Amino acid sequence: MSSFHATTIFAVQHNGKSAMAGDGQVTFGQAVVMKHTARKVRKLFNGKVIAGFAGSVADAFTLFEMFEAKLEEYNGNLQRAAVELAKEWRSDKVLRKLEAMLIVMNADSMLLVSGTGEVIEPDDGILAIGSGGNYALAAGRALKRHAGSQLDAKAIARASLETAGEICVYTNDQIIVEELE
């Protein structure tokens, strides 16, 4: 799968709270910023689940809708909804061409969902995707490791995205953070 430009999504669970942050930049091709304030992180299922996407915007909206339908079908069971979405995404000839990745989380767990059928739960309660994902991941791991009670999940998520935005040209400082307690 090619690298996705135009976004960074970061999710963290820390001290009993969960937060996900995403920047607002949408890049057309490799040279033009089309939008600065896109909302790529959203609460779903009556505010009990947060989902964030990296990749093609139209593809991601399709996946958001499909994932939300799976959440409803499986009564909010995050793992089951994610696995069923990944199975359908991977096996359907049309859906297989969608170019996006999702991070989904509730108060208890978080998962990376991809079109190649992967559903991955991290060992350390941190996930990041998109063009600035590795920068945000490194910053987030350092912050979480040394934060103790001085930083909450929301602060770690915001600071990780800010760091990625300072390094990655496809990530801006128009950050949206959603939090679960």
Curated annotation (Swiss-Prot):
Supply the name of the protein.
Answer: ATP-dependent protease subunit ClpQ
In its UniProt entry, the species of origin is given as: Bacillus licheniformis (strain ATCC 14580 / DSM 13 / JCM 2505 / CCUG 7422 / NBRC 12200 / NCIMB 9375 / NCTC 10341 / NRRL NRS-1264 / Gibson 46)
Keyword list, A-Z: Cytoplasm, Hydrolase, Metal-binding, Protease, Serine protease, Sodium
Q: Cross-referenced Pfam families, in alphabetical order?
A: Proteasome
Family, similarity comment: Belongs to the peptidase T1B family. HslV subfamily.
**Subunit structure, as described in the record:** A double ring-shaped homohexamer of ClpQ is capped on each side by a ring-shaped ClpY homohexamer. The assembly of the ClpQ/ClpY complex is dependent on binding of ATP.
Reading the lineage from the top rank, the first entry is: Bacteria
Q: What class of enzyme is it?
A: hydrolase
Quote the catalytic residue positions.
S2
Query: Which NCBIfam families does the annotation name?
Result: ATP_dep_HslV, PRK05456.1
What this chain does, per the record?
A: Protease subunit of a proteasome-like degradation complex.
**What SUPFAM superfamilies does the record tag this protein with?**
N-terminal nucleophile aminohydrolases (Ntn hydrolases) (SSF56235)
